[in-house]
C-alpha cells in the first residue's frame, strides 16, 4: 500500500510518538520544529527533551523567507543562527570574561546561555522576580502558550548551565564598579 505521512504543528517528540502509535500514519514530518532546533531529533532520541528549543508557532521568520524572495535566508525567533550556522558556531574562548547581562527576558537569557556555552562567566540581573520578560507576558494570550513555555525553558536552561542569575537586582553604576565586569550588555526594553 501507500505510505502515509503527516505534518504541521507537530512540535514535541511526545506528540509525534502518539500519532505514530495510533498507527494511522507511517511517518511524521517536523519541519519548523527542526528549524527551531536542528538537534531536535538527536535530543529526543537521547531523552534530552528539556534541552530542545521548541518552535513557538509564530510563523515570522520561516514564513517571511518564503514570502520575501529578497531575504538571504529564512530566520527563526527561537534559533537566531538559522541560515548563519557557520558564522554563529559556538567555540570555547581562551580568555573567559565576566559579562554583566542586564535584563532577564529572552534576549538576556539567550545572551547569558551563549556566553556560558562559550566559556565566559555571565551574571544575569533581572530587576523583577520573574525571568522571561515580555515573551512570558505574551504567552498569556490565547493560543500563545508556546511563548510562555519557551521563556520558562530558557530560564531553566540558563540555570542548568550554571549561569549566575540574580533576581530583583537592577544593574547600577555601583554594581558595575563593584563587580568590574569586562563587558555590560543591556538586554531589556522600557
What residue ranges belong to the model's regions?
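Glycine-rich phosphate-binding active-site loops on the catalytic face of alpha/beta enzymes
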Residues: 25-40
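Cysteine-cluster motifs in flexible loop/terminal segments that predominantly coordinate metals
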Residues: 41-95
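Conserved acidic residues
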Residues: 3, 26, 182
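FAD-binding core/adjacent interface of flavoenzyme oxidoreductases
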Residues: 56-68, 90-92, 164-188
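Beta1-alpha1 glycine-rich phosphate/pyrophosphate-binding loop at the start
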Residues: 2, 101-167
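Conserved small/polar residues in nucleotide/adenosyl-binding loops
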Residues: 1-8, 189-190
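Catalytic cores of alpha/beta
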Residues: 11-23
Amino acid at each position: 500500500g501507500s505510505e502515509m505521512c503527516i505534518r504541521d504543528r507537530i512540535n514535541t517528540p511526545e506528540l509525534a510518538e502518539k500519532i505514530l502509535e495510533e498507527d494511522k500514519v507511517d511517518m511524521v514530518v517536523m519541519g519548523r520544529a527542526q528549524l527551531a532546533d536542528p538537534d531536535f531529533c538527536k535530543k529526543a532520541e537521547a531523552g534530552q527533551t528539556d534541552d530542545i528549543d521548541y518552535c513557538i508557532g509564530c510563523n515570522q521568520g520561516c514564513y517571511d523567507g518564503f514570502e520575501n524572495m529578497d531575504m538571504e535566508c529564512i530566520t527563526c525567533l527561537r534559533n537566531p543562527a538559522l541560515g548563519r550556522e557557520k558564522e554563529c558556531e559556538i567555540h570555547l574562548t581562551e580568555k573567559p570574561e565576566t559579562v554583566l547581562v542586564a535584563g532577564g527576558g529572552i534576549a538576556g537569557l539567550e545572551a547569558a546561555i551563549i556566553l556560558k556555552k562559550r566559556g565566559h562567566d555571565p551574571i544575569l540581573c533581572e530587576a523583577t522576580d520573574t525571568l522571561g520578560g515580555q515573551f512570558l507576558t505574551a504567552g498569556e494570550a490565547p493560543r500563545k502558550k508556546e511563548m510562555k513555555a519557551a521563556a520558562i525553558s530558557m530560564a531553566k536552561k540558563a540555570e542548568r548551565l550554571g549561569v549566575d542569575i540574580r533576581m530583583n537586582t537592577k544593574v547600577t553604576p555601583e554594581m558595575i564598579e563593584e563587580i568590574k565586569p569586562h563587558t555590560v550588555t543591556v538586554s531589556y526594553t522600557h
